[in-house]
A protein has these predicted regions:
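Long, contiguous binding/interaction regions
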Residues: 1-92
């Protein structure tokens, strides 16, 4: 029986500033929810660094957060948490 395959080496040097774009409906509480999740994974997260970009029609909002990534596991869990939030449509 072959041993389990090892994870490939990371292309990211940790710790590093890591931008994540989160898109969802332009609704009350969306930005606050994204910021709250970011703070759970990066307690030093600066909400002042959040970038907002509304869609052309204004129905959707792109929120770019930059977190301090400390590990692949942290980023994976952050992406999972954001992706499963009911207000979030897409995480890039």
């Amino acid at each position: 029986m072959d041993p389990p395959a090892a994870d490939p080496p990371s292309l990211i040097e940790y710790p590093s500033a890591f931008p994540i774009k989160v898109m969802g409906a332009h609704a009350d509480g969306f930005v606050e929810a994204v910021v709250a999740i970011a703070r759970r994974f990066d307690p030093a997260f600066d909400a002042g660094s959040v970038e907002l970009r509304p869609s052309r029609a204004g129905n959707y909002l792109g929120v770019t957060i930059t977190v301090t990534a400390t590990s692949r596991a942290q980023l994976d869990e952050l992406y999972r948490t954001l992706s499963t939030h009911p207000m979030v449509k897409v995480v890039l």
